[in-house]
Design a protein with these regions (language model features):
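Active-site acidic/histidine proton-transfer and metal-coordination neighborhood
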Residues: 12-13, 20-21, 38, 59-62, ...
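Residue-level recognition of beta-strand->loop/alpha-helix junctions
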Residues: 52, 76-77, 107, 159
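Histidine-acidic metal/acid-base catalytic patches
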Residues: 2-45, 54-71, 170, 175-188, ...
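A short, flexible beta-alpha/helix-coil linker loop
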Residues: 80, 162, 221-224
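Short, well-ordered beta-strand segments
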Residues: 47-49
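Short secondary-structure boundary segments
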Residues: 77, 136, 218
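Non-membrane alpha-helical structural segments and their capping/turn regions in soluble enzymes
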Residues: 86, 90, 114, 118, ...
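Glycine-rich, proline-tolerant flexible connector loops at the mouths of alpha/beta enzymes
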Residues: 74-91
């Protein structure tokens, strides 16, 4: 039996969200006397990291998200450059709205100077979002703290596993931000966290008060050798992850 790409993705997403439910469908017919229990409310807001479409233009990206029934995107600068004019930003939002997609954040944006931090915060303000996914140099964190207070934004540091020295895992982000403004936290990339030898489920539980965004992926190994693979075929325990997301009220 053949399935369309849309059917494949929608069935896969539905299956993933059902993993954390408290009841399992039973083969027996429901009792005709007892009223049916209300359906569980899905608390999650499923979005897409703009970087996923690094090799695709904005039109293709938005058409794909619409087909997949995904309505949120983290805006990457190759789709909306940091030096965009206000008119270009309005046109970007209009195009997103035509496909029922909303930009909820910008990034990841790498920041190696105070000037680059200033530019990123100004960009986010003009775009109209309150969350920046960023990667600042360690020594710039006090300046990020200052800007978060000034703009009243949340700032989620994207962790990168063993591939680069800065922010390899959730614990590293926590240790560098725990004494800063509580609006500074992390984008928990569960694949990279595992690739650095960590347990993303345990890390979500420990650090959930500072988890402002998540990148969901599966990987083949809990080491630098791990590479991306279809969800369910790798090493991440997704039923446990979904249960933990519910437990800590991550939405």
């Amino acid at each position: 039996m053949k399935h369309s790409r849309r059917t494949f993705f929608k069935q896969g997403l539905a299956g993933a969200l059902l993993l954390g439910t408290s009841t399992i469908a039973r083969a027996a017919l429901p009792d005709p006397v007892k009223p049916k229990a209300p359906k569980a409310v899905n608390p999650f807001h499923l979005g897409m990291a703009g970087y996923t479409f690094v090799n695709f233009d904005l039109d293709t990206t938005l058409k794909t998200l619409e087909r997949l029934d995904i309505h949120y995107i983290c805006i990457k600068d190759f789709h909306l450059p940091l030096n965009s004019t206000d008119e270009q930003i309005r046109a970007f939002h209009d195009k997103c709205a035509a496909h029922k997609v909303t930009g909820y954040a910008v990034g990841p944006i790498y920041m190696k100077s105070e000037e680059e931090i200033d530019r990123a915060f100004d960009y986010a303000k003009r775009v109209g979002v309150k969350l920046i996914v960023g990667v600042p140099n360690y020594e710039l964190l006090p300046y990020v703290d200052k800007k978060v207070k000034e703009y009243d934004f949340h700032y989620a540091i994207h962790l990168h596993g063993p591939d680069i020295k800065t922010y390899p895992d959730a614990t590293d982000v926590w240790e560098h931000t725990k004494d800063l403004d509580p609006r500074i936290g992390m984008c928990l990339d569960v694949g990279h966290d595992l690739r650095n030898g960590c347990d993303p489920v345990a890390d979500l539980k420990k650090y959930h008060t500072r988890v402002f965004d998540m990148h969901i992926k599966d990987v083949t190994d809990s080491s630098k050798a791990g590479v991306g693979i279809e969800i369910g075929r790798g090493k991440i325990d997704f039923p446990a992850l979904i249960r933990m997301m519910r437990e800590v009220n991550y939405t």
